[in-house]
Design a protein with these regions (language model features):
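Glycine-rich phosphate-binding loop signature in dinucleotide/nucleotide-binding domains
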Residues: 50-55, 106-108, 152-156, 205-208
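Residues at secondary-structure transition points
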Residues: 30-38, 69-73, 77, 94, ...
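N-terminal beta-alpha supersecondary unit
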Residues: 1-66, 141
Length: 233
């Protein structure tokens, strides 16, 4: 079963193809371009260089959030359009699940974080069990100081990953919250990856949906919506 995974939920654009639980190919782009400019050409490229067309794809998977409001909308819209055109089933995957998948071969607590501004992060926590990231804290928006209070009590290794990693690390250092069991994996492990999205979808085939059922997961209002509510009192 070939699944095409798509991520536009943060700065990088990413696509990946798996065949059952095996990686076929993956592609990243981090050039400061908007996802609306990059994601469809990336899909064309990864299909072409593997001798495939959309007719060879059995399912689509997308990271539906949390993350960039605009990016999430673009990814979801692309998947909905392709699903409608080709009548392909879809899977929605939490962006935080996709990030945590990078640490499936480690042992300890995985703390997936994405920048949510104002000393907050989007976060979910995972325990690595038998090579799988088992979610123990569901997706949420949380103050970094409150996140610290949770993870500081953990005795084992703690891996802080995601595009909010630098923000969390800086906050911990400025507030004397660093601990010897906190680890900060490098750039590649901080990425939310289209191939992870595809592989996670394959592991949960019972959760398939049709295109119109795929919805963005925001967790909080956009900045514009927050400002509008303030003006309205």
């Amino acid at each position: 079963m070939k699944i095409l995974g798509i991520d536009t939920s943060a700065k990088t654009s990413s696509v990946g193809i798996c065949d059952d639980d095996k990686t076929v190919d993956e592609l990243f782009l981090d050039k400061g371009l908007t996802h609306s400019e990059t994601i469809l050409p990336m899909i064309d490229e990864i299909l072409t260089r593997n001798g495939l067309t959309l007719d060879d794809i059995d399912a689509l998977a997308v990271n539906n959030g949390p993350g960039s409001f605009t990016g999430i909308r673009i990814g979801v819209a692309v998947v909905k359009g392709l699903a409608f055109e080709k009548n392909i089933p879809c899977y929605e995957v939490s962006t935080l699940d996709s990030i945590a998948y990078n640490c499936k071969d480690k042992s300890g607590l995985v703390v997936a974080v994405m920048d949510a501004r104002r000393n907050q992060v989007y976060n979910a926590n995972y325990q690595i069990i038998d090579g799988k990231a088992e979610k123990i804290k569901n997706d949420r928006s949380i103050l970094i100081k409150d996140l610290y209070l949770e993870i500081s009590e953990y005795d084992g290794d703690v891996f802080v990953i995601g595009d909010g990693q630098d923000k969390v690390k800086e906050f911990f250092e400025e507030n004397n919250m660093t601990q010897d069991n906190f680890y900060y994996p490098d750039y590649y492990d901080n990425l939310q990856k289209g191939i992870n999205t595809a592989l996670i979808a394959y592991s949960s085939l019972k959760n398939k949906k049709c295109g119109e059922e795929i919805l963005p997961l925001y967790l909080k209002l956009s900045q514009a919506e927050q400002e509008l509510r303030k003006k309205r009192g």
